[in-house]
Structure formats: structure tokens, C-alpha cells
């Protein structure tokens, strides 16, 4: 964009009027963004709202801030509410904590860089569409048949909701359905694109996944354990600007000290980790080659199905057969949690995805990789 502005006849025009956020929220954003270097925009944003709103920053000395954030959420006002965290692990912990308190919270789910097109349920739907391919245009009959087969086969899968939402959105934007358009739409999408949080009392998300969304009340849980790079500061700025009316920041660092016109609270309490912790496994947390021996068993599972944990294996609950093996890194991580008094209480299927090694032969078939949730409980 900077280079384009320097082209002959090029001009850089800043849009400075904000009709979305309250005055104090916009003021906080203006104060904070001054700490970000190398920005194209230089003019401060002007709030066109009549609402002052509220900005409150709570500075903690505690390493863990889950409990005070949850307490704060229980006192939330009217309107849509979101909690923004830095990591997926923090987001899942907050989700479990709020659900345990009776709050209908939903997580903006992610596959951590994995393609939505590799999701088991999505793969099956695409195969059903491909089987009826006769021209570049998808016939209405073939489309409805693919929907019926996929929705029926995976009716008990929690992940089917993302496929349903994907199909609905494609139908809304494509009156005539072409194979090429469908493939491009699915290939370029991610799971979070199809997270329907419209009926949630509280939405939980990482700051990274919140871009493009807005909420009346935004709570930010920011642990000061990362280097304050420009990229990180830009993420925090995105988080701040998600708030329409009220912004509440919980932090144990000084990164938000540049915000002036706000309420500040000093909390000297030491808070424990919640009694229940959820760890979401990714590819690096399991031995991928182990799935060569359990493909059919994995494909028979559905998202949210119960698993049993017999270290270092995840087993199919009805049969007890081992279908996944944890990596050494994950075993070491669990050992650290054990020193804090936590043990694996239960496990369940989160996603099943197609995977193939980059070094695999062309004719080698893809594996079905199980990505699970491990629920830890303090003994």
C-alpha cells in the first residue's frame, strides 16, 4: 500500500471517522497505537458516537488471571460480549470455566493453520458432489443428494455444524453452483469462518481470530510473557478496536500503560489455575505414523465422541483399542501438569482431518489423523 501511494498520481487517504465505537474506546485505541512503529496511518481516529462507554484496565500481580476474568464476566452488562486471549489454550480454559459457571459460552474454533478442506466431514461432502459431476455446473439434484448423504452420515458429529454453515453460505452467494467456485470457496476457507456464535451469551476467541468481528463488551486477557513486537502490538490494537461500547483489560504487564483516559485497578491477589483444564492436541502432539494402523477405526469416530486415555495412548471407548499415540513432547507437557496436581480425567474427539506426509510417495493414501481434547482435573 505504501508503494502504491508513492506511484505517480498516487495519494494516501486516511478514513478517520469512527461510527462504531464509543469515545473512550476510540481514545484508548489512539493512545495505544502510538507504541506501534512503521504505521502508514498517522491521524488519530475520531469517534462519531454520543456514547462515552467505559475502559477499565486491571493490573494483576498473579501469573494466572482466568478466575478474575470469569468473575468480571459474571457482572457483564447488556449486549454482545467477547473474551479475547492470546493463545488457543487460554481460550479453551476460559470456555470450560464459563460453561462450568452456567454461562452459555462458545469458542471461535480453529484448526491452527490446517485447511478446512481437510476436515473429514467436508471431505466426504466434496466426494459426494464429485461423484455426480457431469458438467462444470453442479446440478440441483446432485447438490441436494450430496447434502443429504453428508448430513445423514455425520449427523452425530459436532463438526458437522461447520459444513452446514459452509453449504449455507455458498448457497447464499452462488445461485448457479459451479465446481470450480465450490472448490475455491472451500479451499480458501477456515473453520472459524463458519463458527456460528449468534446464540452465545459470551464468545471466546484468540485476538488473532477476532479480526472482522465486533462486540458491545470486550474483555482482554493478556499475559505479559511475550516480546512486545510490532506484530504483537498490532494484534492487541485489533483486540481493542473490537469493542463497540466497553473495554475491560486484565493484564499482569505494562503494555497498556500508554492508555490514559481510563479507570485503573491494581489487583494484588494471587489466583490459582482453574480446577479443570482442557488441552487441544495438534499434529505435533501425536505420532502421525501411528495412524497408519488405525485409519478405519478413526474414520468410524465422530467429533465429540468419548475416548479413553491409557498413557501414552488414546483409545476407542467402546472397544478399548489404541488408535492414537501421544508424542514425547505432549507426554512431557502432561508430566508438568501432573507436578501441579492435574491428571487426565477424560478425552474426546475434536477434529478428524486428512493428512499426508510431504515426503510420501504420490500413490500413498492419506491418513486420518485424530485431534483430541484432553480434559485435566486437579486431584
Regions found by a protein language model. Name each.
Residues 1-53, 57-59:
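Conserved RecA-like helicase ATPase core segment
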Residues 79-82, 320-322:
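Short active-site oxyanion
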Amino acid at each position: 500500500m505504501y508503494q502504491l501511494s508513492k506511484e505517480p498520481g498516487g495519494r494516501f487517504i486516511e478514513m478517520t471517522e469512527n461510527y462504531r465505537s464509543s469515545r473512550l474506546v476510540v481514545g484508548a485505541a489512539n493512545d495505544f497505537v502510538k507504541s506501534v512503529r512503521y504505521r502508514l496511518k498517522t491521524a488519530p481516529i475520531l469517534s462519531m458516537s454520543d456514547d462515552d462507554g467505559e475502559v477499565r484496565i486491571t493490573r494483576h500481580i498473579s501469573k494466572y488471571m482466568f478466575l478474575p476474568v470469569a468473575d468480571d464476566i459474571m457482572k457483564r452488562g447488556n449486549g454482545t460480549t467477547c473474551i479475547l486471549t492470546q493463545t488457543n489454550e487460554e481460550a479453551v480454559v476460559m470456555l470450560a470455566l464459563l460453561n462450568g459457571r452456567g454461562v452459555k459460552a462458545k469458542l471461535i474454533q480453529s484448526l491452527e493453520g490446517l485447511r478446512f478442506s481437510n476436515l473429514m466431514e467436508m471431505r466426504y461432502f466434496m466426494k459426494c458432489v464429485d461423484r455426480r459431476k457431469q458438467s462444470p455446473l453442479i446440478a440441483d439434484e446432485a447438490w441436494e443428494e450430496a447434502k443429504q448423504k453428508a448430513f445423514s452420515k455425520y449427523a452425530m458429529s459436532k463438526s458437522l455444524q461447520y459444513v452446514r454453515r459452509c453449504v449455507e453460505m455458498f448457497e447464499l452467494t452462488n445461485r448457479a453452483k459451479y465446481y470450480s467456485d465450490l472448490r475455491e470457496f472451500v479451499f480458501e476457507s477456515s473453520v472459524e469462518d463458519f463458527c456460528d456464535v449468534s446464540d452465545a451469551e459470551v464468545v471466546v476467541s484468540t485476538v488473532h481470530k477476532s479480526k472482522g468481528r465486533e462486540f458491545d463488551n470486550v474483555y482482554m486477557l493478556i499475559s505479559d510473557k511475550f516480546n512486545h513486537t510490532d506484530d504483537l502490538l498490532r494484534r492487541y490494537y485489533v483486540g481493542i478496536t473490537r469493542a463497540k461500547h466497553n473495554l475491560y483489560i486484565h493484564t499482569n504487564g505494562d503494555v497498556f500503560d500508554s492508555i490514559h483516559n481510563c479507570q485503573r485497578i491494581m489487583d494484588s491477589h494471587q489466583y490459582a489455575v482453574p480446577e479443570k483444564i482442557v488441552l487441544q492436541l495438534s499434529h505435533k502432539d501425536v505420532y502421525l505414523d501411528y495412524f497408519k494402523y488405525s485409519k478405519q477405526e478413526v474414520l468410524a469416530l465422530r467429533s465429540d465422541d468419548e475416548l479413553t486415555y491409557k498413557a501414552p495412548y488414546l483409545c476407542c471407548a467402546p472397544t478399548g483399542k489404541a488408535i492414537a499415540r501421544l508424542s514425547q513432547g505432549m507426554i512431557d507437557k502432561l508430566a508438568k501438569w501432573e507436578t501441579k496436581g492435574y491428571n487426565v480425567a477424560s478425552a474426546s474427539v475434536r477434529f478428524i482431518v486428512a493428512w499426508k506426509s510431504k515426503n510420501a510417495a504420490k500413490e500413498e493414501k492419506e491418513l486420518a489423523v485424530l485431534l483430541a481434547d484432553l480434559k485435566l482435573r486437579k486431584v
